[in-house]
Amino acid sequence: AQHYYVDESNGLKYELDYEKHTAELIEQQGTSGSNFDYSSLYSAEKYVVPSYVADEGVRYKVTKLGASCFYNATNLKEVVLPATIEEIGNGAFIRCRELKKLQLNEGLKKIGEQCFKYTYSLEQITIPASVTEIGKLLFNLMKNNQQLTITCLSSSPAEVKGDMSIYSEFYAHHTLVVPRGCEAAYKKHPIWGKFFVTDYTDTATGFKYKLNATAKTAILVRNTDADGKSLYTATNYVPSTVKDGNGVEYVLTELGDHCFVGNDKRYAWDAELNNEILQSIVLPPTVKKIGWACFNRCLNLKDVQLPEQLEELSDSCFAVCISLDG
């Protein structure tokens, strides 16, 4: 039989194990919508999860955040976890769009899959050394421009059940911090190693890249001044490879989102987005993907030579390219 307890002070609901004297924090569903898009009754901006809860004079140790326990808690910005938590269930923080920072407790052993899906505001997360297992797609469907910093405290990489996102470019947009002297161990890992991506600007061309040190691939990204104005002007040829400062060669495989937009700090209808200089561009055969709104508002762009091997042309790639033929 299932036994439940609701803490009246904060509304948190627990499933109690009478034999083990443990408690699991579970979800509280609110109103339902289509496709299981129900709201959460956890409406506060901050929750402090206790180490123990008491029901009818019996204490229960809180050891787990259940699956989807904070699902769609749209106001949630901060959660403080006790040292007693050993497991975080699948999808525990899905759609917590305001959650910005999370310090996971030492003693945590397992993090479930898709735990931080759609956490669009998440900026920092620390994974303690005690974590030994992480589910697949942990950061699935997050925004590339979040600039998430993931700090791992263990000297050896935790086991990961699969890629952390369905999008391969995820690793190029976020940062992994590991203990000093442990970089080699993480670089060798098939998943963690994908995070070893560095920014590099080719002074000869002015092109800015995200370099993946593991795959030896490059993504061409926006290069802007302090006001967000694009530094790309009359460019018409993009090279297939780039060498970093150490002479290591990387193959260009992708053009990033809004790469040639005139200004990235303006609204989509603002004229300062316009790039009025670029007229033609030739892309190398190594490019497999062109990102979202890559050439948006390149008003005088007339000719684009796309590679035959191109696999993905993202939405709004040539939006408002009013001079482009055919």
Pin down the residues of each PLM region:
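Extracellular/surface-exposed low-complexity segments
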Residues: 1-3, 173-204
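N-terminal segments that cap or nucleate solenoid repeat domains
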Residues: 2-57, 68-72, 201-248, 253-260
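Structural signature of tandem-repeat unit edges
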Residues: 37-63, 74-87, 97-110, 120-133, ...
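Consensus positions within tandem repeat domains that build extended binding/scaffold surfaces
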Residues: 66-69, 89-94, 112-115, 135-138, ...
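A structural signal for leucine-rich repeat
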Residues: 139-141, 163-169, 190
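Extracytoplasmic/secreted cell-surface and envelope-processing proteins
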Residues: 159-162, 185-187
